UniProtKB/Swiss-Prot annotation:
EC number: 1.3.1.90
SUPFAM superfamilies (alphabetical): FMN-linked oxidoreductases (SSF51395)
Major enzyme class: oxidoreductase
Gene name for this UniProt entry: DUS4L
Active-site residues, Swiss-Prot/TrEMBL: C116 (proton donor)
Positions in coiled-coil regions: none
Catalytically driven reaction(s): 5,6-dihydrouridine(20a) in tRNA + NADP(+) = uridine(20a) in tRNA + NADPH + H(+); 5,6-dihydrouridine(20a) in tRNA + NAD(+) = uridine(20a) in tRNA + NADH + H(+); 5,6-dihydrouridine(20b) in tRNA + NAD(+) = uridine(20b) in tRNA + NADH + H(+); 5,6-dihydrouridine(20b) in tRNA + NADP(+) = uridine(20b) in tRNA + NADPH + H(+)
Role: Catalyzes the synthesis of dihydrouridine, a modified base found in the D-loop of most tRNAs.
Keyword Ligase included in the entry's annotation: no
Species of origin: Homo sapiens (Human)
Protein name: tRNA-dihydrouridine(20a/20b) synthase [NAD(P)+]-like
Disulfide bonds: none
Cofactor: FMN
GO function terms (MF aspect): flavin adenine dinucleotide binding; tRNA dihydrouridine synthase activity; tRNA-dihydrouridine20a synthase activity; tRNA-dihydrouridine20b synthase activity
Entry superkingdom: Eukaryota
Length: 317
C-alpha cells in the first residue's frame, strides 16, 4: 500500500464525512469503482472536473489482508485523494473487517461489492450473489462497525436488483438496520447487461429507505445525471463508462475537452501511470473526437513519447 504523505496528515484530510454531502440537497456526483481504471491518477483527473466522491477499483479483501504485494499494487492514494471509498470484494466478515482496519487511516470508508455480475466473482462468493445472502451482508457490515470505531468512517454497499423488487427492498432495509451508511443501486438484475436501466426500481428503493441512495447505470452526461437524480429522488449518481469516455462530464462538457486530455497526460506522467493504462484511458477519451483512421493510428502507438508526439502534432497539446 502506497501513500505520498504521512499517515497523520492523511487522517487530518479525511475528517470530512461524505454523508454531509448526501444531506446537502445537491446532486452528489460519484466516480464508480472500475477494475483497472478508477485508480489514483484517474481519480485525480475527475476530481478536477467536479467529481465529488471517488471509489477505488474493486479489491479482493482476502488477498489484500494476506499479501503485502497485493496491498502495494492495489491501493495507492495521496493527500488530495479525498473523499475516497475503498471497494472490497468479500464473503468473510473477519477478513473484510481486517481489510477495513488497514485502509481506515487512508480513506473515508469502505464499500462491499454486492453487484459485480462476472462469473469468476460470483463463483468465489463475491459480487452479485451477495444480494441473495442478506444475512451475510449484515454480518459483514456489523463486523466492520464493531472493529473500526473511527468517527465518520462509512460502510456502504453497491447492489444490483432482483426480479422481485420486494427482495431488494428487504435486503436494503436489513442493511440499513445493521448500520450501512448508504446504498448504491445499479438498476439491472445480475443477468441483465445492456437492457434499459430500471430507474423506476431505484426510485421505489429510495422511497423505502431513510439512508442515502445513489443511482447507477447508463449515465453519459451531466444532463442525464441530473435527470436520473430527479426521476429517482436519490441523493447522488454514480458513473463508470460515461466518465471513462469523458472525465470532464460532471463539469458539463459534452465531450472530452483538450484541456482534460492535457491534464491526463500531466497527471499520468507525474504519478508514473503504467503505459497500457495511460494509453487505454486516452483511447476512451478520444473516441468521439477522432476519425476511424485516426483511431487506427493512435491505438497502434507503442510508447509514451509517441503518444505525446501524436497529441502535439494533431492537437497542439
Amino acid at each position: 500500500m502506497k501513500s505520498d504523505c504521512m499517515q497523520t496528515t492523511i487522517c487530518q484530510e479525511r475528517k470530512k464525512d461524505p454523508i454531509e454531502m448526501f444531506h446537502s440537497g445537491q446532486l452528489v456526483k460519484v466516480c464508480a469503482p472500475m477494475v483497472r481504471y478508477s485508480k489514483l491518477a484517474f481519480r485525480t483527473l475527475v476530481r478536477k472536473y467536479s467529481c465529488d466522491l471517488c471509489y477505488t477499483p474493486m479489491i479482493v479483501a482476502a488477498d489484500f489482508v494476506k499479501s503485502i504485494k497485493a496491498r502495494d499494487s492495489e491501493f495507492t492514494t495521496n493527500q488530495g485523494d479525498c473523499p475516497l471509498i475503498v471497494q472490497f470484494a468479500a464473503n468473510d466478515a473477519r477478513l473484510l473487517s481486517d481489510a477495513a482496519r488497514i485502509v481506515c487511516p487512508y480513506a473515508n470508508g469502505i464499500d462491499i461489492n454486492c453487484g459485480c455480475p462476472q462469473r469468476w466473482a460470483m463463483a468465489e462468493g463475491y459480487g452479485a450473489c451477495l444480494i441473495n445472502k442478506p444475512e451475510l451482508v449484515q454480518d459483514m457490515v456489523k463486523q466492520v462497525r464493531n472493529q473500526v470505531e473511527t468517527p465518520g468512517f462509512s460502510v456502504s454497499i453497491k447492489i444490483r436488483i432482483h426480479d422481485d423488487l420486494k427482495r431488494t427492498v428487504d435486503l436494503c432495509q436489513k442493511a440499513e438496520a445493521t448500520g450501512v451508511s448508504w446504498i448504491t443501486v445499479h438498476g439491472r438484475t445480475a443477468e441483465e447487461r445492456h437492457q434499459p436501466v430500471h430507474y423506476d426500481s431505484i426510485k421505489i428503493i429510495k422511497e423505502n429507505m431513510s439512508i442515502p441512495v445513489i443511482a447507477n447505470g447508463d449515465i453519459r452526461s451531466l444532463k442525464e445525471a441530473e435527470n436520473v437524480w430527479r426521476i429517482t429522488g436519490t441523493d447522488g449518481v454514480m458513473v463508470a463508462r460515461g466518465l471513462l469516455a469523458n472525465p470532464a462530464m460532471f463539469a458539463g462538457y459534452e465531450e472530452t475537452p483538450l484541456k482534460c486530455i492535457w491534464d491526463w497526460v500531466d497527471i499520468a506522467l507525474e504519478l508514473g501511470t503504467p503505459y497500457m493504462c495511460f494509453h487505454q484511458h486516452l483511447m476512451y477519451m478520444m473516441e468521439k473526437i477522432t476519425s476511424r483512421q485516426e483511431k487506427r493510428v493512435f491505438n497502434a502507438l507503442s510508447s509514451t513519447s509517441a503518444i505525446i508526439d501524436y497529441l502535439t502534432d494533431h492537437y497542439g497539446i
